[in-house]
Amino acid sequence: MEVLVDVEITPKFLGLKFMKYTLENREVWKNKKLISIDANSSWFGKRYYVKGRREEGGFRIEGSAFSGVIKDTFATTSYFTPDFLKRRIWVSTQDGTPLEIKTRKLRNRKVSFNDKDYSVTEWEISGDLELTLQYDQHKNWVGSGFTVGNYPARFILNNRKNNIHKIWQNS
């Protein structure tokens, strides 16, 4: 399974842009294991990268903040299938850093999107990465909450069609 991620975050305050974050990421997965990654990102104009490939004995990463081999089964930080909640190591798709995380189910709640209410289950991610993740009743990832430079940010998936959780289950 090939996953392509293209992100641009440009928050504005009083009409002024105060930062810009971009990420272009290509991941190849097979049997729920990452085979390769090629990611480039920019934050406040500084460039970051991650390149990696599965090899005998683990997954070799060359990144702007970490280079080495990870032997554990891990997740990445660009897409959040519910299976990732069981994995204790997540690799930053910004700079390659292995992140030790813990997960905790919070609660079910309602969120509104396009004038329609949805029931979601919210999870807290803590440790080297702090965020909340939301999944709908079909286990599709539909939202996130995190902090960007001291400011709370909320992400809600605009298009619920073609969510890759079904594809992930069969990969």
Predicted regions and their residues:
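Acidic, serine/threonine-rich low-complexity disordered tracts
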Residues: 1-55, 75-171
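Acidic/charged, solvent-exposed loop-and-adjacent secondary-structure segments enriched in E/D, K/R, S/T
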Residues: 56-75
